[in-house]
Structure formats: C-alpha cells, structure tokens
Amino acid sequence: MFPGVSVELHKHGRPVKIHLVSTGAVCVKRKFRDATKTGVWAMIDFMLDKKFTEWMPIWVMIVEHPAGLFVIDTGENADVNNPGYFKSSGLFANWFDTTQFKFDVEREEQVGPQLEKLGIKIDDITSVILTHLHLDHIDGLKYFPNTRILVNKYEWDKPFGDLPKLYPSWFKPTLVELNERFEVFDKAFYLTPEKDMVLVETPGHTYGHCSVIIDCDEARIFFAADICYSQDQLLNERYSGTNAKHALAQNTYSKVKAFSKGRKVIFIPSHDQHAGERLKMLTPIF
C-alpha cells in the first residue's frame, strides 16, 4: 500500500544507506488523530467518534551505517487481525484495540520479510532501537530474539498505553539512560562512536517517547515516531487525542521546530503518508 524508499547519503564521505519500509497500514478514529480537546476529554471525544481516518503507513527505518546496522522500531505483524489477539491484555484493551483502530498487514509486509528483500540478514543487525513501547512499534520483535534491543529506561519504567502481554517471552531489552545533551534536546544517548546518530527524548505521546536523529552530510534525518501523525500537524500546532501529557507534547513540538530552523532536517513521523517522498527528495521541514 505504501512503497518503501531507499536513499544513499554520506557522513564524511562514507555511505549511509537509509531504508524506510511500511509494515502494513493502520487507520484510527478521526478524533484520535486530530483532537480538538486534551486529556480525558480528548479520549472521550475520539471513543464516541464513529468515523475513521484514511489508511496510514506504519514506517520502520533501517540504517546501514559505518558503525553498524540499525533497525528503528519493528512495526506491526499480520497476526494483529486474528480473533482474540488482544484478549490476553484484558477486557478494556481488547475492546479498545479492536474498536479504535483498523489494521491491514500482509505477511510479506512484516519487518522480517522486508529485511530479506533488502538483502539484510537479521544476524548482521547491530541493534534494534524502540522509540516507545506501543503495539505498532514492537509487534515485529519476534524476528529479533538474539539482537540487542535498546529502550529508553524512562519509557520502560513509566510506560503509557503499552501491552506487555504481547511482548515475546524472551524480551529483556537493554535499558539506556539518556543522560547527555544534544543541541536543544536535554536528554540524549549517542548510538554511534562518532555521535552522528543519536536517540533523543521527545515526550508527549508517552512519557519516555524518543526519536532518532541521523546526522549526514546532505541532511539530518529525524525519525520522529509518534511525536505527531504528520509534519502538517507539527507545523500547524495540531495534536492527537492520546498524548500522555499535552504540555510535554507542546514542548516537544517547540524543540523540534527550534532544532529544524536554519538547517536541512527531514522529518519522518511513523504514520505520515508523505514521509517517504520527503525522504526520497530530501525535502526539509523549513
């Protein structure tokens, strides 16, 4: 439904290949994506909404970097539409996740087959980086039982909206503390020795939500995960209806815009239909 995009960029003249693949598609209640209220009122508003958005991608980013092979988020899997998939998570979660979302995921769209198409062996992957612990970002973990998986410790300690019953039984991620600073971002963890790939805390959607920034010669690639549903939301100060804390989301918006002004930043939210084209054309926020 959403074709993948691959670009070859550089860092100090060395190639950095970036692949963006969609592990199926999702649609949500319209007021889930585009809220007119905040907090509990936003939740009530979207639960009463009877209309869904159009189909949106579930992007996963794969980075072939001189320091290693990195997978950012793992996307969704085809079992999500199986009857009873959410029952282990309790009555409310089962009701919520079967009435507020719709998924369309084929087996070949899962992250494992997508990596195979790219000629990437799972055993060669250096790390999987999870931006946060929501379903459509962790549901491809089954392909990575022997891979180092990085999670922000704060996201792990104070989750929001996660479904741990759906984690693989072996899932014990490496918890990282974001105790450094990167430009406007107060909390950061460097993923490469040259500090050209960095995990930054971008809270709002969850308390410990993170994004990944890749600093290349041509541009900075900003994998934003669920900061917002689209670049348009960011630019027009519109918010989703499911933020853990609205004030945190507002602050993150301000930081992203401050970071992006005066430089070439390619902004890639996980569910933005136009993100692939922006990556292909290296179209910046400003």
What are these regions (language model features)?
Residues 138-146:
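Conserved nucleotide-sugar donor-interacting segment of glycosyltransferase catalytic cores
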Residues 178, 183-239:
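Glycine/small-residue-rich hydrophobic helix-like segments
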Residues 1-120, 124-136, 143, 219-225, 261, ...:
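Metallo-beta-lactamase
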Residues 23-24, 74-77, 133, 155, ...:
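Active-site metal-binding loops of divalent metal-dependent hydrolases
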Residues 78, 83, 93-111, 217-286:
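Cap/insert and terminal regions of metallo-dependent hydrolase folds
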Residues 5-16, 35-38, 150-151, 156-171, ...:
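C-terminal/domain-terminus segments
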